[in-house]
Regions:
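Short hydrophobic/aromatic-rich motifs at helix boundaries and adjacent loops
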Residues: 19-25, 64-68, 90, 122-125
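Interfacial helix-start motif at the membrane-water boundary
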Residues: 56-69, 78-82
Length: 170
């Protein structure tokens, strides 16, 4: 167990909580906007999803991720269906990730929840019939983003952002 896991993280002030979550939501939204061409549909590599590993280090980031996802999904061709269902997936995944401290396991909730729930929503609301194929495509996209980008982001944040956010030295 490393120093980060041994020490109790101090509570954030309301101002810092709101500012950090605003930044997280804005970065998520910006990444989806810039990479729209690969952020929607069954075959997607939503770069912003790499941030869904952050609750493992910063449980408070659940709010920013949820808001960022909601705002991003309003750009989807699926409209409010995606805004609501995608946001619920992100919220549940972030809450689960916040209790998992090992990065390779912390990346699993967003991968698994999005992989199984989003194709189900497409099946129920849009008549998509290839449920298991869509599960596979979403799984591949999520896994690539979370493990290729999310894990390095986790280690970068652990080294460089944890001391700033929690005002501590490791």
């Amino acid at each position: 167990m490393d120093t980060l896991e041994k020490q109790k993280k101090p509570k954030l002030s309301v101002t810092r909580f709101l500012c950090y979550n605003g930044i997280i939501a804005a970065v998520y939204l910006t990444l989806v906007y810039v990479f729209q061409f690969m952020s929607f549909n069954a075959v997607q590599f939503r770069i912003a999803e790499c941030m869904t590993i952050l609750p493992a280090l910063f449980p408070f980031s659940t709010l920013g991720l949820t808001v960022g996802c909601f705002l991003s999904n309003t750009m989807s061709v699926w409209g409010w269906i995606d805004a609501v269902s995608g946001t619920i997936c992100t919220l549940i995944a972030a809450l689960l990730t916040s209790v998992i401290k090992k990065p390779y396991l912390a990346a699993l909730p967003p991968v698994l929840i999005n992989s199984f729930v989003l194709p189900l929503v497409w099946f129920l609301f849009a008549g998509e019939t290839a449920y298991w194929i869509n599960v596979l495509w979403v799984f591949i996209g999520q896994a690539v983003v979370l493990y290729a980008l999310g894990i390095p982001l986790y280690y970068f944040a652990k080294k460089h952002l944890v001391p700033i956010v929690y005002n501590t030295r490791l």
